[in-house]
Amino acid sequence: MRILSKRQVTELVLYSPQHIARLEKAGLFPKRVPLGPNRVGWLEIEILEWIEERLRRRDEP
């Protein structure tokens, strides 16, 4: 299991940190994992599944 940093997630999904926060608040993005008082991360598998879901939607008729 791998945890991605905010920078890694923004590079992977090509969204700004602010947009990711809005999606999280709306329940449309994987939840962050608190790592410390000022540090968060995301499970890589959840981010990859989120991307795959978008790809499946793209391919739907």
What is each of the regions a protein language model found here?
Residues 14, 35, 44, 48:
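Catalytic phosphate/metal-binding cores of nucleic-acid and nucleotide-processing enzymes, i.e., regions
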Residues 46-61:
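A short, Lys/Arg-enriched interface patch at domain edges and termini
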Residues 33-39:
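Short Lys/Arg-enriched helix C-cap and helix-to-coil transition segments
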Residues 2, 40-41:
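Residues that recognize and position ribonucleotide moieties
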Residues 26-33:
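Short, solvent-exposed alpha-helical "recognition" segments
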Residues 1-23, 52-53:
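Polyanion-binding surface elements
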